[in-house]
């Protein structure tokens, strides 16, 4: 029978684990916390670790998620600004950074944030260099990601599901984001009179409405594009689940 987690026994348990076991447990509980929004078990585990383990990157990342779920914004910002994280952790921590600022601003304004307000928040609160490699982003799409998508678009304007999955892995985006980029790219070129009409097919039905790059130059003789809406509604943001190392043995978690 699987042993249930008992916070009263956590101090004894945490002192008996090796560093690798602590990393595996933290990563698993972190991923579970991202999915469920519940971090009580994660908090009990890391708070009872010996002081020498408190500076481990997996523990610091777990602490950041606990601060996020408990809406302790100041401590979250301080931790992310003062602790250097490895590049493979940047994306998930950047998501926490942005979502925390969005939630904090929405609570202050007592209303849901629009696209313009979120854009201003991102400009006012850039990522600290502890979770950012310094590469320029455009609507949260990195330059290298946009270049990969542009090259793929030149080869095929209607990628298959498998192509989208491959591009999502290459660009570190979701399949929906890749689908939206191709859809909006086709729409912009159609409006500019640049898309080959014979290539338009019924599979131009990807869901979503988020674009990533600027409009192409307009031809004076081309038909004018439809007017832009006066407001924009963004889909709710959910942090992406963290993918942990394959060597982690999660059998340790059964003993919690």
Swiss-Prot record:
Residues 134-193 bind DNA. The lineage of its organism: Eukaryota, Metazoa, Ecdysozoa, Nematoda, Chromadorea. Interacts (via N-terminus) with eya-1 (via C-terminus). This is Homeobox protein ceh-34. Keywords: Developmental protein, DNA-binding, Homeobox, Nucleus, Transcription, Transcription regulation. Residues 187-233 are annotated as: Disordered. PROSITE patterns: HOMEOBOX_1, HOMEOBOX_2. It comes from Caenorhabditis elegans. Disruption phenotype: Exhibits early larval arrest phenotype. Does not affect the number of pharyngeal cells or the expression of pan-neuronal genes including ric-4, ric-19 and unc-11. Several neuron classes fail to acquire their neurotransmitter identity including 7 cholinergic, 4 glutamatergic and 1 serotonergic neuron. Alters the expression of neuropeptidergic genes in pharyngeal neurons including the reduction of glr-2 in M1 neurons and the elimination of mgl-1 in NSM neurons and ser-7 in I2, I4, I5, I6, M2, M3, M4, M5, MC and MI neurons. InterPro entries: HD (IPR001356), Homeobox_CS (IPR017970), Homeodomain-like_sf (IPR009057), SIX1_SD (IPR031701). Acts as a transcription regulator. Binds to the sequence motif 5'-TCAGGTT-3'. Binds to the cis-regulatory element of proapoptotic factor egl-1 gene and together with eya-1 activates egl-1 expression to promote motor neuron M4 sister cell apoptosis. Also promotes apoptosis of I1 pharyngeal neuron sister cell. Together with eya-1, required to specify the coelomocyte fate in embryonic and postembryonic precursors. Required to establish and maintain the differentiation of all 14 classes of pharyngeal neurons. The gene is ceh-34. SMART domains: HOX.
């Amino acid at each position: 029978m699987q042993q249930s987690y008992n916070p009263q026994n956590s101090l004894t348990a945490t002192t008996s684990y090796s560093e690798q076991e602590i990393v595996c447990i933290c990563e698993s509980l972190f991923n579970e916390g991202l999915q469920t929004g519940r971090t009580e078990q994660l908090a009990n585990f890391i708070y009872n670790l010996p002081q020498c383990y408190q500076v481990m990157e997996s523990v610091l990342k777990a602490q950041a998620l606990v601060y996020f779920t408990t809406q302790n914004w100041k401590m979250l910002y301080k931790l992310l600004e003062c602790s250097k994280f490895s590049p493979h952790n940047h994306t998930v921590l950047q998501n926490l950074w942005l979502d925390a600022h969005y939630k904090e601003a929405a609570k202050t304004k007592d209303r849901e944030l629009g696209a313009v307000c979120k854009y201003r928040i991102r400009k006012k609160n850039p990522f600290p260099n502890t979770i950012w490699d310094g590469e320029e982003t455009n609507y949260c799409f990195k330059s290298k990601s946009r270049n990969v998508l542009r090259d793929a678009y030149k080869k095929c304007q209607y990628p298959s599901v498998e192509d989208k999955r491959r591009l999502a892995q290459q660009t570190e985006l979701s399949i929906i984001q890749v689908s939206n980029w191709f859809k909006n790219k086709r729409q912009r070129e159609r409006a500019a009179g640049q898309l080959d009409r014979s290539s338009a097919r019924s599979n131009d039905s990807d869901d979503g409405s988020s674009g990533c790059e600027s409009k192409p130059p307009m031809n004076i003789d081309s038909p004018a594009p439809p007017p832009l809406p006066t407001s924009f509604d963004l889909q709710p943001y959910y942090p992406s689940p963290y993918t942990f190392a394959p060597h982690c043995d999660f059998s340790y978690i059964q003993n919690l």
